[in-house]
């Protein structure tokens, strides 16, 4: 470990309590995708306090802090921290105002880039850097609240439901040559990544006819029955999904009716259709649409299926030698173990980091 690396670690250790306090504040004020207004403001204020040039409003809530912008012609490196949380109302540390909780650890990502910013803005360290560093707080990695994101799309505020996809579309990565993304996990320190699923998202809306559920059900058109048949038809498609494609389709009913004694006249389903490659995503998506269409035809309800772009499949990433060496140097003399990622390992989950790699 050279003198600069030692000084970086010293700076982070010196500000340990401040970094942890920032993380805990974000943790207890979790916000959902494209709604991270408080989180965004906190990140902006912290980066400004360090004397960085800061810009905000990227993909609604994204924030960029620039170190050494005069050197961006050499290399421009982004350190990325995701801001959004998950809607988990029953979580012990849920934010009661948003019903969100940081179950995926994005608060730790933000603490990571804040800690890096504290260290790298040290004048003695900053002058050793050959390029620009961009501390980038990004929105909406978790792909929840599909209908809300569709509303933003219809309002012209976004085109893509995923934060990094939208940032790419806006050109927010045009001044960045490479990005470093990190995430909490089971291992002490894991460098590199395996592959992961991509997906499209869908909203299925069944429109029936209300009637008294006991007195005159024959006068109604039961949208919930149409949805139930659609879900059953989808279940019968599962044997056609090949294991090698790692297909995952997991719908939820977000609206199932209004009153127990009224035939449901509107039912809404949201789902992701995931797979390991684009051809498999297209195939599974077509089968999913046919299944939900069948439910509507069987019952005689109207229906509307909206399909939105999700994320591209995540590509494997070999452990970068420089990152690996830095991780090993930083953990030397500690109990932390540095491991190279198994690039052959596939995850059924998804991340919009995949869109950065394509």
Indicate residue ranges for each PLM-predicted region.
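Alpha-helical metal-binding/catalytic segments enriched in His/Glu/Asp
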Residues: 97-147, 200-206, 212-237, 271-273
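Acidic/His- and Gly-rich active-site-bordering loop/insert found
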Residues: 2-103, 107-134, 139
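Short Gly/Pro-enriched turn/cap motifs at secondary-structure boundaries
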Residues: 55, 156-158, 193-196, 343-347
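Generic non-transmembrane alpha-helical segments
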Residues: 7, 11, 15, 22-25, ...
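Zn-dependent metallopeptidase/amidohydrolase metal-coordination segment
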Residues: 333-358
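Acidic/histidine-rich catalytic neighborhood of metal-dependent amide-processing enzymes
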Residues: 111-195
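Midchain, well-structured core segments that form catalytic/ion-binding scaffolds
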Residues: 168, 173-321, 325-326, 346-354
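Soluble non-cytosolic domains of exported or imported proteins
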Residues: 34-38, 158, 221
């Amino acid at each position: 470990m050279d003198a600069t690396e030692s000084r970086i670690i010293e700076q982070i250790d010196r500000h340990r309590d401040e970094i942890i306090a920032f993380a805990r504040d974000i943790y207890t004020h979790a916000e959902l995708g494209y709604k991270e207004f408080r989180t965004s403001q906190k990140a902006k204020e912290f980066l400004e306090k360090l004397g960085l040039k800061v810009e905000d409003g990227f993909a609604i809530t994204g924030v960029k802090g620039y170190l050494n912008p005069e050197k961006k012609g050499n290399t421009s490196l982004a350190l990325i921290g995701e801001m959004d949380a998950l809607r988990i109302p029953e979580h012990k540390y849920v934010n009661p105002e948003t019903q969100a909780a940081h179950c995926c650890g994005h608060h730790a990502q933000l603490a990571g880039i804040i800690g890096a910013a504290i260290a790298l803005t040290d004048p003695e360290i900053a002058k050793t850097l050959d390029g620009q560093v961009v501390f980038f707080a990004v929105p909406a990695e978790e792909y929840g609240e599909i209908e809300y994101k569709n509303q933003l799309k219809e309002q012209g505020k976004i085109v893509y439901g995923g934060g990094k996809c939208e940032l790419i579309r806006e050109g927010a990565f045009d001044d960045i040559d490479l990005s470093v993304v990190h995430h909490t996990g089971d291992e002490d320190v894991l460098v590199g990544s395996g592959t992961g699923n991509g997906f499209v998202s869908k909203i299925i809306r069944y429109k029936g006819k209300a009637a008294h559920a006991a007195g005159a059900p024959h006068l109604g058109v039961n949208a919930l029955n149409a949805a139930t048949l659609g879900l059953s038809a989808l279940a019968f498609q599962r044997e056609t999904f090949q294991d090698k494609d790692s297909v995952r389709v997991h719908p939820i009913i977000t609206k199932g009716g209004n009153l127990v004694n009224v035939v449901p006249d509107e039912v809404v389903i949201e789902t992701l259709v995931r797979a390991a490659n684009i051809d498999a995503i297209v195939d599974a998506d077509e089968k999913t649409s046919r299944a939900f269409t069948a439910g509507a035809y069987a019952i005689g309800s109207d229906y509307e299926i909206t399909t939105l772009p999700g994320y591209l499949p995540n590509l494997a990433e070999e452990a970068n030698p420089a990152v690996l060496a830095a991780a090993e140097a930083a953990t030397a003399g500690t109990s932390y173990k540095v491991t190279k990622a198994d690039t052959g390992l596939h995850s059924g989950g998804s991340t919009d980091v995949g869109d950065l790699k394509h």
